[in-house]
């Protein structure tokens, strides 16, 4: 609409208001006078009512004022009021036209969201996670989408976002709580309707969780174990590519974990560590044990697990030095579980992943790690989150709100500190469809980029983004770009006149459209401590106020003492679920050792004594043969003649042939290792 058309429309509205007001006064006056004949004939009849021309009031007023002065005074006041209404409409229209001239969008149309737009987006609903406040009203998001917050340390993200949300969310929650503050403030209220579980691998009173018991026996066992090994070999979440040692140790860990699950009485990661580094036997003997254990067969027909046997054979086929490197690499990933406190915390399951969404009551799981141990225990917390994310997004059985008993909120404060979780990054895109919401909090964009790389999809998959005043220029620039660009009208005045004149006789005013960010990066970094920015997809940005739970009685009433933890069995936990491995113990079967083409072959040292266990001999007896020493076989300093040297060579070849005769029919190489 052009400015000229707006002006014409404004004038038409003013005249219409005045005309309707005078017409209404005329009709009211005629009604009060009883539509008498001296008033003249009506203009027309509408539904039995005589309608007079609008200006008849003034004729009647001139001729009959003396007969009914009060009636004409009131009619005149009514007509005059219409004039005032017309003036008010003219003023309002002028103001509106002035604002419309200012709403230019040549370079951009960014602006702050209006209250009616926020209401339409349902951000004032009394449900969902907390985002902040606006005009003394809570800003909350109750959709299935994820939320991401950028807030520097000590900026109020805990007291304004995490604590209020946990003190109002009635579904299940997984809370990454580094310092334990959220446990102290929110577990008391949440324990009234949910199972409150504190998992702190450095605290003997912690609830227990054994990642190996989440492995499902059967077709899924290899996949589940490989997922566990993926996290074990990448404890920091910083590997983009694995080197040779990490790849081979991954294969060894998969085989060792499967063997422990099938054969060992204690089915824990601590047992995997002690199994691979048992001081009572050599590493080669451990590999032989893996290849000769009856994992799958019955008593009359033993059968080794093919994945276990393949992993053991892969390592056994390597040279002694390479085997040692593979073992040391694998043990470096299992060192955490040698800690007795960590081993105790992972020795059993007080809760299962399925309980998070299908238990009788919601689950409130607090993953608490002291800052002093955060680097050491990071692999275990990463493993738990990885298992939760993978297991709960495997199957979609209809609407999750109907098929699941509880919705799950993953409140991950300082989530980049956990390192890169590849599955978590990709799962954000479809996690909401399974009834899982993520509330992610990071200090800055740099922290996220350091963990997930520059081109990560974390921010892209978050529907709602919250930004506090930033200390990082890159984050401030990203927020400024996200807010968009507005178009402003700048007035330029030029004054002209005589130098000695008392006033300047000519003033020229010109208006120019210019582009300006809604907030510059500097303004983002200079936001007041009480302000925050809320960006919702499909809605103009919101400049809101931070929430402080300790200033709101609705929250302070819910801050209750946390549950008391005692030594021994954890008290507040759901009913136990049956796993697939408890009670499953298998032993070595000698028939498998007899069938294996290299059973019992152990090389103690290169160039040393080779001990070969013959299937026909008792287990305690070994056949010992002296392997030819390469230096003695080909000694350039030997003074013997060529004939004598040839005879010595033939003697040693005969010795090797006799040693080979022991293994005749088993397919062993004459010279092992080649």
Give the role of each language-model region:
Residues 462, 673-674:
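Acidic/polar low-complexity intrinsically disordered segments
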Residues 1-155, 159-161, 208, 351, ...:
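Basic- and hydrophobic-enriched, low-structure N-terminal and domain-boundary segments
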């Amino acid at each position: 609409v052009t400015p000229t058309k707006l002006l014409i429309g404004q004038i038409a509205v003013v005249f219409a208001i005045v005309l309707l007001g005078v017409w209404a006064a005329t009709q009211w006056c005629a009604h009060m006078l009883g539509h008498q004949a001296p008033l003249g004939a009506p203009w027309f009849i509408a539904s039995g009512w005589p309608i007079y021309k609008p200006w008849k009031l003034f004729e009647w007023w001139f001729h009959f004022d003396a007969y009914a002065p009060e009636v004409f005074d009131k009619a005149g006041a009514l007509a005059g009021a219409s004039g005032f209404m017309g003036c008010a409409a003219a003023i309002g229209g002028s103001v509106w036209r002035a604002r419309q001239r200012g709403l230019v969008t040549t370079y951009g149309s960014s602006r702050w969201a209006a209250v009616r737009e926020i209401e339409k987006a349902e951000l004032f609903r009394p449900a969902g996670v907390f985002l902040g406040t606006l005009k003394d009203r809570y800003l909350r998001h109750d959709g299935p989408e994820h939320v991401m917050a950028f807030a520097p340390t000590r900026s109020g993200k805990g007291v304004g976002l995490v604590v209020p949300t946990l003190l109002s969310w009635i579904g299940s929650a997984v809370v990454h709580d580094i310092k334990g503050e959220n446990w102290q403030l929110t577990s008391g209220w949440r324990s009234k309707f949910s199972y409150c579980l504190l998992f702190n691998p450095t605290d003997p009173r912690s609830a227990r969780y054994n990642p190996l018991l989440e492995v499902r026996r059967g077709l899924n066992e290899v996949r589940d174990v490989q997922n566990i090994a993926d996290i074990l070999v990448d404890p920091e979440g910083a590997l983009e590519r694995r080197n040779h040692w990490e790849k081979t140790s991954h294969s060894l860990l998969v085989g060792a974990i499967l063997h422990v699950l099938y054969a060992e009485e204690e089915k824990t990661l601590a047992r995997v560590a002690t199994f691979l580094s048992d001081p009572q036997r050599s590493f080669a003997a451990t590999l032989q044990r893996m290849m000769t254990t009856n994992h799958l067969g019955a008593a009359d027909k033993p059968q080794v697990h093919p994945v276990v046997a393949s992993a053991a054979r892969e390592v056994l086929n390597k040279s002694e030095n390479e085997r040692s490197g593979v073992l040391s690499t694998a043990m470096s990933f299992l060192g955490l579980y040698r800690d007795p406190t960590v081993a105790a915390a992972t020795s059993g399951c007080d809760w299962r992943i399925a309980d998070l969404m299908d238990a009788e009551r919601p689950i409130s799981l607090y993953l608490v790690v002291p800052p002093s141990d955060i680097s050491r225990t990071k692999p275990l917390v990463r493993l738990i989150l990885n298992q939760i994310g993978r297991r709960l997004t495997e199957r979609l059985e209809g609407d999750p709100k109907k098929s699941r008993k509880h919705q799950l909120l993953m409140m991950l404060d300082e989530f980049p500190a956990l390192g890169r979780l590849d599955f978590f990054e990709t799962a954000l895109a479809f996690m909401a469809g399974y009834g899982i919401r993520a509330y992610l909090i990071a200090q800055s964009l740099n922290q996220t980029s350091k963990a997930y790389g520059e081109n990560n999809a974390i921010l892209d998959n978050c529907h709602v983004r919250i930004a506090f005043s930033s200390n990082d220029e890159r984050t401030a620039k990203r927020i400024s770009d996200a807010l968009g660009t507005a178009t402003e009208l700048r007035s330029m005045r030029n004054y002209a006149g005589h130098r000695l004149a008392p006033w300047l006789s000519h003033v020229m005013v010109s208006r120019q459209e210019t582009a300006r960010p809604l907030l510059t990066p500097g303004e983002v970094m200079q936001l007041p401590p009480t302000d925050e920015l809320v960006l919702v997809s499909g809605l103009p940005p919101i400049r809101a106020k931070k929430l402080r739970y300790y200033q709101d009685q609705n929250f302070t009433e819910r801050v209750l003492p946390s549950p008391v933890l005692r030594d021994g069995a954890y008290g507040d936990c759901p009913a136990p679920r049956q796993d697939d491995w408890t009670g499953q113990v298998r032993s070595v079967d000698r028939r498998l050792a007899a069938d294996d083409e290299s059973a019992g072959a152990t090389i103690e040292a290169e160039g040393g004594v080779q001990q070969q266990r013959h299937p026909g001999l008792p287990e305690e007896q070994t056949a010992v043969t002296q392997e030819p020493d390469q230096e003695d076989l080909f000694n350039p300093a030997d003074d013997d003649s060529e004939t004598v040297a040839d005879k010595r060579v033939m003697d040693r070849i005969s010795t090797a042939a006799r040693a080979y005769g022991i293994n005749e029919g088993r397919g062993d190489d004459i010279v092992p290792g080649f």
